[in-house]
């Protein structure tokens, strides 16, 4: 559509009509405004109370300043419940420097932006907007991401194309002065109270004219925020942020306020949100910690004491240097704490060293004076004594007190005992979940204020800052560094991310909170923590074990490796004397190392807790969904336990959704509104639909009304994030104040929400939590009522949730309401959970703190699922009046008929009364031996069976038709090939296309069917691991290869390798024939040259000699097609298998017990040149060990392996300099600092990267096998000075040893790409001309003094000091033209290249003089043959080209001078 066809109104309102400019990134819907996004003023920003932070997508990857893959390269097989915050963040600023010395009096350290901290005013809506979102029905396993990216504290800001262009065209200074955040606004004091402005919606110009703005500047902290007018700000960077702020906070705010449909309650919510936002910014003015101090020189020659200040709720990377005088006035207590830390006598360097025997245990009968901040209870003092007793014996243990008994306080107090009573000053490390980090910090501040405890979290820059300023007292010391802190508090994620840094420290004590996370001995977290050098370990968990004996073995083995053997499972369904004896023996062995106390035993003052199950009918809509789910999955249900586990589990999840709320299904809301409100989206209809469509919501609505009236405060737990969204909509429409916490809420906002809810004057009535994210160590005891909206498979998760309110410090009786839908799977799940709890506590009574050992998984197996699904299903097919019951529901009746549910039996640690206790809870199992045919009514059953039979008949007919079609197609192809008719082959393609999808499905299910995807996976695996015959089962198990039969993969592997050999053999044969033919022509041509029939100066460029030379140096990848996959590299396959086989044999035969001891011995490979890290022979050995361990191309794993020790010497994610890339194509000169954008600068990219590592490994493998001359390794490609020297002739290798030009794994280009593209990257130097052999990629063409680097695409001179004239000549010369011109005297060039090491000095001088004369004479005869350059200029080009063959580095001008001198002497 042309612009003229668009109306003026549309053009003036592009956001309203969905228009955007083509050169801009598409606007993304955002829930909260982030005014740092100054480059996209067309965003239509949506408000939502559910999301506190902005989702930011950084489209400019080259400006990313994070640690790289992230976290994408991190292992994620053991993930956390609450730490998946990757999508939340703050903008990144370019050229930000770390905190360092400043010379200005004010704070000039570049703080990182806090734009994401700006949660905006909520624009109230009159109806739900949930249908506009992508629905997420998943149970809240998003919290299960162990790798929570705490970079959400401060992530990247998406930079617009305009800003990128501006940044590259006009580089900003290190600390530019610009707008970081616009915080607030007010009317100018010169105006009246805005009588007119308040009644109209201002435009952007009015906002600029009439308001002042509170600005946070980019180069200063929030302490230096200033009020500015638009005119006083001037033209500074970030001015567009001011425009965005005006649109969002003034214009849109006024539009909402003037909307006649907006209620007073909505405006009140907006005002409260604005106040909350401003209160949050006030927090950024408060110093939280003083990190360091310095004496800075000012411009007037004086000096000033400055403090490096970390601000409250901001990360370490936003710390700034401030005038100490100002900070002393602002935060004197923090200054005192800093001084105390600087003068501390409990630094780790002052620790006592108990080498032989530790001091004997001395019981603490009273609370020692160094445990401050409160009074320990007797059982807590007992816990400290128990931990001290274990330490004295050198043992480790599990603190398994029930939730809410103060395990955190006991651990902190024990660390204080270690430091003050045993002089074990640290460093100690505590690993905790993200959600509990604030609670741990508060506990240290209260109970151990004298300890230096640092919180190790945040983005990469924050952690770098922590390591630089908080880790060592002497960070710049070359020798041993001394630790500065006593305790390091961190999360699981950073154990994995910074395993190398943290794992290199010797820790005196390690505590792991929520230690059931270590139940999987194969997880990356377990492996990482187990590799730490720790003197003592303590595991902390309120739910010691949740599944089986194997998990108990993992925990015990983590504490005391090899001390216990626990391998026998326990079956409580079939108990016998032998098993009972085993339990008692297990109890006896483990009892000393596990301390487990229950609240009922040790805390008599704790208020009671009552749990009630409230059963409610399904609504008509829910019943319809429930019934449809059962009938539409008839075939899967009838398979029962014989069927697939996952299919039944999916049905179970769908039924649980139907039991909760129909809005969890697509398009359900529209149907409900049609029923309850004639389809009208009014506020009343939306609220009525939300409530009346779900039985639980009807009950919850009445329950919350009653609870609020009685002054209670409520925690509502659900497993489903989407259910929390629905509850949030309900509370918002009802005008109920609430907080929310789930895996999508970033850490900073979590703490704010918890503190806001717990504050004495809080007006929050409800806290919405996901069962998992909200069930880990959070203290919400200001609430006295818990509502479990839907029960978890694992009863421990619900117990964790209840313990948020029922814990020490709670003063009120705690009521727990568990909502259950009648006659649904929820009732049976609850019953089975009840049995699990009874058994668990029975086992605890025997001393074995294992939970659900009778099942191997929390989730039931297929047989159990089938039984659970049948429960209550029959009632779904009978007519009911549930909807009428819901409309007439009486809360008192429901409460009177509620069932009391005991989740914490009155048993404790007593060994008495076990049998009697179990008898009290005997339950009658629901017999699930009936059939689905008995559940579903006969009429519907007959209909389902008819449909099922019809479907089977159709499938049979379809299969027969497909067979006939394939037979017909085969006959037609044979017929067409015989008749020579190629056009008819595709005549029936339309008919055939209908069966392709079914054939693909059939192949996917066929274990012996190998398709293109399997072939590609196999090809990549060969390039990575070499010979796969012995590891096929491992590759299939870990997902590297799709699941197919071993035998078929073995056959395919043999076929692929055979095809590769045949392809190489054929290529060799063809090449040999062509070379023989060209050699004959070249011989005849040489004869003509010798006889004078053809003059050397008149010979054409395209002559037989040139063609032969080009063919000899030609190097193209040998590609072949295999089973539909095109362009597989034959040479790479063959050579990789041989190389890796040689490496494996070498290490296994000599270093099988410890591969890390592998050594190159006396063989010294050629050193690398100009790599960014100090790369020696030792690093080469570690690199080969890494390839042996992880496979070729697994650079990330090799880099991250702390045992290899090359973590900081590999740079895989450095960003290329886009300016350098652009200029490299037009510049052949040596990069100089004065020429911006020419070549590669030292800051553009660090090496080695993936490509360099691949080439280095290729060289090392060939070096080991004796296939490379050590004088010219390929690993030096990419260095700024390439070695020159004589290069041996190499005979062409056999086919199975040759290699392709492009290393497939290491290069960013695909391995099977077109060969022509790879050939373009080859250097076109004279070495290829003079070499009579076909070159291997491991033996590159002898490098020119200025050649193209395949690593970065720029030309790099071997002689940086060469004159500018020579560089200019080489810039303009046509190297290809020079090569053709000089090809006639290739013998002389070749003789020069060979050098004269074995010759007498005089003899060599004579040869040099002869060959130089020959070259010079030829140049003189050819200098006028160029059409592009003048004779004199072309003469310089030819000499410059010839200088590359001189055996030493020499300028072409010197060669010209030498030739002129020889010529003059000859004339005389």
Swiss-Prot record:
The keyword Nucleus applies. There is a cross-link at residue 1144 (Glycyl lysine isopeptide (Lys-Gly) (interchain with G-Cter in ubiquitin)). The modification Phosphoserine is found at residues 36, 72, 987, 989, 1336, 1364, 1372. Residues 699-860 form the Helicase C-terminal domain. Signal peptide: none annotated. It comes from the Eukaryota. Residues 1221-1234 have a biased composition (Low complexity). This is Chromo domain-containing protein 1. The lineage of its organism: Eukaryota, Fungi, Dikarya, Ascomycota, Saccharomycotina. The gene is CHD1.
């Amino acid at each position: 559509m042309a612009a003229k066809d668009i109306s003026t109104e549309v053009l003036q309102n592009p956001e309203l009509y969905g228009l955007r400019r083509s050169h801009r990134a598409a606007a993304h819907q955002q829930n909260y405004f982030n005014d740092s996004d100054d480059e996209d003023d067309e965003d239509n920003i949506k408000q939502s109370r559910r999301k506190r932070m902005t989702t930011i997508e950084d489209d400019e990857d080259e400006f990313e300043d994070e640690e790289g893959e992230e976290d994408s390269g991190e292992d994620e097989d053991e993930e956390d419940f609450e730490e998946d915050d990757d999508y939340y963040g703050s903008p990144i600023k370019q050229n930000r420097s770390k905190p360092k010395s400043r010379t200005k009096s004010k704070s000039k350290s570049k703080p990182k932006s806090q734009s994401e901290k700006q949660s905006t005013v909520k624009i109230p809506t009159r109806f739900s907007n949930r249908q506009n979102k992508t629905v997420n029905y998943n149970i809240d396993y998003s919290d299960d991401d162990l790798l929570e990216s705490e970079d959400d504290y401060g992530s990247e800001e998406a930079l617009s194309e305009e800003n990128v262009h501006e940044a590259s065209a006009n580089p900003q200074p290190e600390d530019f002065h610009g707008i970081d955040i616009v915080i607030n606004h007010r009317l100018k004091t010169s105006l009246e109270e805005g009588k007119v402005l308040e009644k109209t919606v201002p435009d952007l110009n009015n906002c600029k004219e009439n308001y002042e703005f509170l600005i946070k500047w980019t180069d200063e902290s929030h302490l230096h925020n200033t009020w500015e007018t638009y005119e006083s700000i001037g033209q500074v960077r970030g001015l567009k942020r001011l425009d965005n702020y005006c649109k969002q906070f003034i214009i849109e705010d006024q539009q909402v306020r003037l909307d006649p449909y907006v209620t007073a309650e909505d405006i009140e919510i907006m005002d409260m949100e604005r106040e909350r936002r401003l209160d949050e910014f006030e927090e950024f003015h408060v110093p939280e910690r003083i990190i360091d101090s310095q004496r800075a020189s000012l411009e007037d020659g004086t000096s000033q004491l400055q403090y490096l200040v970390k601000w409250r709720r901001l990360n370490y990377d936003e710390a700034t240097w401030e005038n100490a005088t100002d900070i002393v006035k602002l935060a004197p207590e923090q200054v005192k704490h800093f001084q105390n830390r600087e003068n501390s006598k409990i630094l780790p360097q002052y620790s006592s060293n108990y080498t032989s025997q530790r001091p004997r245990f001395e019981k603490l009968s009273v609370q020692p004076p160094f445990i401050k901040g409160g009074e320990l209870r007797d059982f807590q003092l007992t816990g400290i004594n128990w931990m001290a007793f274990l330490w004295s014996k050198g043992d480790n243990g599990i603190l398994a007190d029930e939730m809410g008994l103060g395990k955190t306080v006991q651990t902190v107090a024990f660390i204080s005992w270690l430091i003050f009573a045993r002089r074990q000053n640290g460093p100690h490390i505590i690993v905790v979940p993200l959600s509990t980090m604030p609670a741990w910090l508060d506990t240290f501040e209260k109970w151990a204020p004298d300890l230096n405890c640092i919180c190790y979290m945040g983005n990469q820059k924050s952690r770098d800052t922590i390591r630089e300023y908080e880790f060592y007292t002497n960070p710049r010391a070359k020798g041993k560094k001394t630790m500065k802190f006593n305790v390091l508090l961190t999360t699981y994620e950073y154990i994995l991310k910074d395993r190398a840094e943290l794992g290199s420290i010797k820790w005196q004590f390690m505590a792991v909170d929520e230690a059931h996370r270590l139940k999987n001995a194969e997880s990356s977290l377990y492996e990482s923590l187990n590799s730490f050098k720790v003197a003592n370990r303590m595991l902390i968990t309120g739910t010691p074990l949740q599944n089986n004996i194997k998990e108990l073995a993992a925990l015990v083995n983590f504490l005391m490796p090899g001390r216990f053997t626990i391998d026998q499972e326990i079956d409580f369904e079939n108990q016998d004397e032998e098993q009972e004896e085993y339990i008692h023996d297990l109890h006896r062995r483990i009892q000393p190392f596990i301390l487990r106390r229950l609240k009922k035993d040790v805390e008599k003052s704790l208020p009671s807790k009552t749990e009630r199950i409230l059963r409610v009918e399904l609504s008509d809509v829910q019943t319809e969904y429930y019934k449809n789910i059962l009938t539409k999955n008839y075939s899967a249900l009838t398979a029962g336990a014989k069927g697939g586990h996952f299919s039944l589990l999916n049905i179970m999840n769908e039924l649980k959704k139907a039991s909760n709320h129909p809005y969890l299904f697509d398009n359900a809301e529209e149907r409900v509104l049609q029923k309850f409100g004639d389809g009208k989206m009014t506020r009343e209809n939306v609220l009525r639909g939300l409530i009346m469509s779900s039985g639980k919501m009807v009950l919850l609505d009445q329950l919350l009304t009653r609870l609020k009236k009685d002054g209670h405060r409520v925690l509502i737990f659900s497993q489903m994030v989407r259910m929390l969204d629905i509850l949030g909509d309900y509370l918002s429409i009802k005008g109920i104040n609430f907080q929310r916490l789930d895996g999508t809420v970033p850490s900073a906002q979590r703490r704010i929400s918890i503190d806001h809810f717990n504050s004495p004057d809080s007006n929050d009535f409800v806290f919405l939590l996901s069962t998992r994210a909200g069930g880990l160590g959070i203290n919400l005891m200001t609430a006295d009522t818990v509502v479990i909206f839907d029960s978890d498979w694992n009863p421990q998760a619900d117990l964790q949730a209840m313990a948020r309110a029922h814990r020490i410090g709670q003063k009120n009786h705690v009521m727990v309401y568990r909502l259950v839908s009648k006659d649904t799977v929820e009732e049976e799940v609850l019953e089975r959970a009840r049995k699990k709890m009874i058994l668990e506590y029975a086992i605890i009574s025997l001393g074995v703190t294992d939970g659900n050992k009778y099942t191997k998984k929390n989730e039931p197996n297929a047989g159990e699922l089938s039984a659970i699904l049948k429960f209550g299903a029959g009632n779904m097919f009978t007519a009911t009046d549930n909807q009428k019951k819901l409309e007439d529901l009486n809360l008192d009746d429901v409460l009177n008929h509620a069932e009391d549910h005991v989740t914490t039996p009155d048993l404790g640690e007593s060994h008495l009364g076990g049998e009697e206790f179990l008898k009290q809870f005997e339950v009658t199992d629901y017999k699930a031996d009936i059939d689905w045919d008995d559940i579903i009514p006969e009429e519907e059953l007959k209909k389902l069976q008819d449909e099922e039979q019809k479907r089977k008949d159709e499938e049979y007919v379809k299969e027969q038709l497909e067979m006939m079609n394939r037979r017909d197609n085969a006959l037609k192809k044979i017929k067409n090939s015989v008749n020579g008719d190629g056009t008819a082959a595709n005549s029936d393609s339309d008919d055939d296309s209908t069966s392709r999808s079914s054939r693909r499905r059939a192949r996917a299910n066929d274990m012996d069917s190998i398709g293109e995807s399997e072939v590609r996976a196999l090809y990549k695996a060969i390039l990575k691991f070499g010979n796969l015959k012995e590891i096929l089962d491992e590759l299939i198990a870990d997902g590297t290869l799709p699941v197919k039969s071993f035998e078929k993969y073995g056959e395919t592997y043999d076929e692929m390798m055979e095809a590769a050999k045949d392809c190489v053999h054929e290529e060799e044969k063809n090449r040999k024939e062509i070379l023989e033919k060209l050699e004959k022509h070249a011989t005849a041509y040489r004869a003509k040259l010798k006889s004078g029939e053809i003059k050397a100066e008149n010979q054409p460029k395209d002559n037989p000699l040139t063609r032969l030379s080009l063919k000899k140096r030609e190097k193209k990848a040998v590609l072949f097609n295999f089973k539909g996959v095109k362009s597989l590299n034959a040479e790479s396959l063959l050579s990789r298998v041989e190389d890796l086989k040689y490496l494996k044999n070498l290490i296994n035969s000599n270093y099988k017990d410890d591969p890390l001891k592998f050594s190159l011995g006396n063989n010294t490979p050629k050193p690398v040149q100009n790599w960014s890290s100090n790369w020696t022979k030792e690093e080469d050995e570690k690199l080969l060990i890494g390839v042996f361990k992880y496979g070729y191309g697994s650079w990330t794993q090799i880099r991250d392996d702390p045992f290899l020790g090359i973590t900081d010497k590999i740079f895989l994610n450095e960003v290329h300099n886009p300016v350098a890339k652009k200029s490299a194509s037009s510049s052949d000169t040596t990069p100089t600092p004065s020429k911006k954008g020419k070549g590669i600068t030292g800051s553009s990219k660090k090496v080695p990267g993936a490509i360099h590592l691949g080439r280095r490994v290729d060289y090392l493998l060939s070096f080991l096998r004796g296939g490379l001359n050590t004088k010219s390794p390929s690993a030096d490609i990419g260095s700024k000075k390439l070695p020159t020297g004589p290069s041996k002739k190499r005979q062409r290798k056999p086919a199975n040893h040759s290699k392709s030009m492009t290393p497939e794994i290491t290069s960013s280009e695909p391995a099977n790409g077109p060969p022509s593209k790879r050939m373009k990257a080859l250097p076109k130097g004279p070495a290829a001309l003079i070499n009579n052999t076909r070159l291997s990629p491991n033996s590159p063409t002898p490098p020119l003094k200025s050649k193209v680097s395949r690593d970065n695409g720029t030309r790099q001179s071997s002689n940086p000091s060469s004159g500018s004239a020579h560089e200019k000549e080489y810039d303009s010369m046509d190297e290809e033209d020079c090569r053709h011109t000089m090809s006639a005297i290739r013998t002389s060039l070749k003789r020069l290249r060979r050098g004269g090491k074995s010759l007498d000095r005089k003899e060599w001088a004579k040869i040099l003089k002869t060959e130089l004369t020959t070259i010079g004479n030829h140049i003189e005869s050819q200098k006028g043959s160029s059409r592009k350059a003048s004779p004199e200029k072309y003469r310089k080009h030819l000499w410059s080209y010839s200088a590359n063959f001189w055996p030493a580095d020499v300028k072409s001008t010197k060669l010209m001078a030498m030739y002129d001198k020889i010529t003059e002497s000859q004339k005389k």
